[in-house]
Amino acid sequence: MIMYCKLCSNNQLTQVNSSDNRNYFLCPNCNLISVSPDNFISNKEEKERYLTHNNGIEFKGYVDFLNIAIEPALQFLKKDMLGLDFGCGHTPTLSKLLAQHGFNCEDYDPFFVENNLNKKYDFIFSTEVFEHFLNPQKEISKLVNLIDKNGIIVVMTDRWNDINQFNSNWHYARDISHVVFYHNKTFDFICNEYNLEMLYDDKSRVVILRKN
């Protein structure tokens, strides 16, 4: 099987040494590391895994975690904006937290919450979702198309910075539902490719992008 990058379509990938039984490939063009489709789990297994997560506003740890993305984003949001939580999980929580700040945010999740996504949004949060994209080019294009001009996209996903992380016990790679891993340079590529401006970057987990 010929491997190609699911973000930039480059077909000159290099295999990454890993400490598990999955096959990882690095794209030297955009620095995305992806798992071979041979190692993907089924939709049923993926959904069952999500159902084990303690999501909900009653879980302080989960709320604190979501606030890592919410707090830096507040400076870019206005009360008349309409938002979307893209990949909200089985118990939508981020939209409830934003409501406490006076913001209107709809929910969507391909497994748990239907939304026909037939409108434009002023902001989109996608927390702990990008690493699950089987086809990041397709999904990121969808997100960008859902955002109005000058709209904001808030992304939370743990980034890799050392190739040796995949040959260690890095928790992000050991989660079998995680199939793509982003680098700082990957987000530089995304900004250039989709005409986005980087408004905020914590160099670790959260980026905030604006559509030009």
What is the role of each PLM region?
Residues 157-180, 185-186, 190:
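Short, glycine-/aromatic-enriched active-site segment of Class I SAM-dependent methyltransferases
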Residues 131-135, 182:
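Residue-level signal for the nucleotide or nucleotide-sugar donor/cofactor binding architecture
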Residues 140-149:
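A short glycine-rich, Lys/Arg-flanked "PGG" loop and its adjoining helix->strand segment in the class I
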Residues 127-130, 156:
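Residues lining the SAM
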Residues 82, 150-152:
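Short glycine-centered segments of the SAM/dcSAM-binding site in methyltransferase folds
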Residues 194-212:
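Core SAM-dependent methyltransferase catalytic element
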Residues 78, 134, 148:
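Short conserved AdoMet
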Residues 1-123, 127, 138-140, 174-175, ...:
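Conserved N-terminal segment of class I S-adenosyl-L-methionine
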